[in-house]
């Protein structure tokens, strides 16, 4: 029996409005926010990572040379979402459609602005791999990364606008899933504002 083929859908198509500049390119721990988040995904047990961007050029601002060379080069590919401007739901559904066309048995929704996420947490989520979904949580608050099996794809592909995957979990449409509690809140924090960026820089210094 073969192992499930799992693809990470790495959401990097946001416009960073609250930051005022491309937050993924902001320096952090010798790299930048986006590359540190991507490194975690590429170092995990995921078989492949789809980087979902709004344009091909946008990815060049933060994906550095190390990710275009071994050992990372063949572990990821770029997927441009033509409707990214319409909201995150479109990026999610577009990424899942692409992953499905690549033969994915399951996908993990990942955020490009979660640089404190650990490989251990991501691997633990993948190891759960239930028949429906597995979601990360801290003190009861659900957040990416979120695993979805192929049985959930029809629902996830229906997301649009600013709808997030969490709405599906709360709707009950997907049945019972698994919850993986993070060891600390910082691991699941995303970065949207200059204040949050400063906090993460201090935490990771």
From Swiss-Prot:
Alphabetical list of Gene3D superfamilies matching this protein: Spore Coat Polysaccharide Biosynthesis Protein SpsA, Chain A (3.90.550.10)
Family annotation (NCBIfam families): pucB
Residue stretches spanning the membrane: none
Source organism of this protein record: Bacillus subtilis (strain 168)
Record's note on what induces expression: Expression is very low in excess nitrogen (glutamate plus ammonia) and is induced during limiting-nitrogen conditions (glutamate). Expression decreases when allantoin is added during limiting-nitrogen conditions.
Protein name: Purine catabolism protein PucB
Protein keywords: Purine metabolism
Molecular function as annotated in GO: nucleotidyltransferase activity
Annotated Pfam families: NTP_transf_3
Task performed by this protein: Required for xanthine dehydrogenase activity. Could be involved in formation of the molybdenum cofactor required by xanthine dehydrogenase.
Pathway given in the UniProt record: Purine metabolism; hypoxanthine degradation
GO biological process: hypoxanthine catabolic process
């Amino acid at each position: 029996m073969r192992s499930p083929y799992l693809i990470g859908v790495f959401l990097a198509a946001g416009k960073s409005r609250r930051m005022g500049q491309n937050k993924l390119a902001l320096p952090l721990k010798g790299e930048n926010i986006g590359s540190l988040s991507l490194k975690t995904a590429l170092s995990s047990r995921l078989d492949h990572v789809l980087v979902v961007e709004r344009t091909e050029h946008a990815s060049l601002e933060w994906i550095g040379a190390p990710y275009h060379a071994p050992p990372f080069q063949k572990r990821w590919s770029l997927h441009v979402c033509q409707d990214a401007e319409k909201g995150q739901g479109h990026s999610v559904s577009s990424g899942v459609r692409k992953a499905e066309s690549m033969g994915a048995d399951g996908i993990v929704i990942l955020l490009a602005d979660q640089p404190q996420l650990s490989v251990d947490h991501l691997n633990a989520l993948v190891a759960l791999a239930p028949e429906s979904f597995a979601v990360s949580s801290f003190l009861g608050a659900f957040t990416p990364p979120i695993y979805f099996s192929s049985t959930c794809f029809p629902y996830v592909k229906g997301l649009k606008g600013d709808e997030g995957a969490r709405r599906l979990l709360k709707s009950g449409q997907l049945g019972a899933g698994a919850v993986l509690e993070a060891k600390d809140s910082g691991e699941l924090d995303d970065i949207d504002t200059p204040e949050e960026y400063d906090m993460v820089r201090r935490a990771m210094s």
